Amino acid sequence: MDLADLMEVENGDHSINQKHVQITFFSKDEEIPQIPDAVFDVPTGAECDDMNLLLNKTIEANDGAWKERRFEFLVGETFLRTSLAEFIEEYEVETETILKVECVIGIEAPKPLHDIQAPDWVSSVQIANGHIFSTTYGGDIVIVDRKGKETKLAVNSANRLLKCISIVKAPSKKNQLDGTEFVVGGENQLLTLYAIEKGALVEKLILRGHERAVECVSVNSDSTRAISGSVDTNLKIWNLDASDEATTYEKEEEEESAKKRRKKETKTKVPMVTIGGHRDKVSAVEWCPWNSGHAFSCSWDHTIVEWDLELAGEISRIKGPKSFTSIDLHPKSDLLISSCTDAIPRLYDPKNRDGSMVKQSFIGHQNGWVEAVKWNPLDTNQFVSVSTDKTAKMWDVRSSKSSLFDIHGHDDRILCATWNEGLIATGSADCTIKIFETA
């Protein structure tokens, strides 16, 4: 039975009267069994559901144990989201030869989980150990769990615009909040390391050294070092070990007031190393996944730089078309996804020394620019992007011209995003944090 027959049986469609195109299926996905090397004569009115029907019946005929699954279909670098006829017309696909259709395992769309009201614009967001941590332009630190319950913690950051957060340590006990440590940075040029102890927020370290607002911070995998970037164009490396005296800052003059004496109880540290090299503000920093002595930064000077932190020197530089707003390196594939002050996320291979060559550009956002991109740490193909166009998009790197899913809900531009523990969290200028569950 061919697809025209199947479509007529399943849907009552008179597919036999439609134009036809010849297709063949293939897959690079290890989860998909060997697909018969057959050519199918398919009506151009066929859509994804029809193609799924044909492929599942074909596999089942060769594998009696096969259980029906949902597939996504790629033609070239674009997911099939319409009928074949519409797709062929829109993308001017050549139909004189056999059309090769790639099959990938389908996934469910992200499900809205929680909509959290924040006191101000949301500037950054992270997920760790069953909790979502975010900062705001009003200086607030908002913490909610997977159930949407907020933990109220007093934060001594009134009138201090916060821009970034990075988790330092998460407790070994699942979903526990006590014992969590994180570092935040903002407009007052400082970074502060906090710990949650017995339900209270405790200031553990002050990191002093930047001369202008801190834009970004990232902690390494063993929680011993942090790297930060600033509007002052510099990167600074910090030792997070409170017992380390080499980078401890001691004020020479005697403190006079009791308030100042209390403040002195929080140890202040200066940077281990300062690295200059950017010509404009540093917008994002990330530790290198394959070399703990290296890090990456991006800047409004249109560059992404890989640094040797021990030598405080540049290793390689990627030149982009616009000011970069964010980067993220996948822990498994080592590929780098980036966003700029335009509507296009771009994929680079930083191990390729001709790194300025873009591997892939992803077209889909409208107007404005992409504020942030974040990989799915469990899948080397998937990432999320958020934009000033008020949308988030979930992408598969195998399709550059159509996103997997569009995620709507925000009423103003989206400023930050993260993806971890099966959750996507986005923060916006509409003063909300939206949490979505992914399959």
Curated annotation (Swiss-Prot):
An annotated GO cellular component: PeBoW complex
An example of a GO molecular function for this protein is:
ribonucleoprotein complex binding
Q: Which InterPro entries match?
A: NLE, WD40/YVTN_repeat-like_dom_sf, WD40_repeat_CS, WD40_repeat_dom_sf, WD40_rpt, WDR12/Ytm1
UniProt feature coiled coil, ranges: none
Q: Which Pfam families does the UniProt record give?
A: NLE, WD40
Where does this protein reside within or beyond the cell? Answer: Nucleus, Nucleolus; Nucleus, Nucleoplasm
Say if the entry is tagged with keyword Repeat.
yes
Instruction: Provide this UniProt record's keywords sorted from A to Z.
Output: Nucleus, Repeat, Ribosome biogenesis, rRNA processing, WD repeat
Query: What parts of the sequence cross the membrane?
Result: none
Q: What is its main location?
A: nucleus
Question: Please, one GO biological process term?
Answer: maturation of 5.8S rRNA from tricistronic rRNA transcript (SSU-rRNA, 5.8S rRNA, LSU-rRNA)
Renumbered to this chain, region (Ubiquitin-like (UBL) domain) spans 21-105
Please report the residue spans annotated as repeat (WD): 117-154, 160-204, 209-248, 277-317, 319-358, 364-405, 409-439
- The segment annotated Disordered runs over 248-269
Question: Which superkingdom heads the taxonomic lineage of this protein's source?
Answer: Eukaryota
Q: Which family does it belong to?
A: Belongs to the WD repeat WDR12/YTM1 family.
Summarize the protein's role. Required for maturation of ribosomal RNAs and formation of the large ribosomal subunit.
Protein name, entry field: Ribosome biogenesis protein WDR12 homolog
Q: What is the species listed in this Swiss-Prot or TrEMBL entry? A: Caenorhabditis elegans
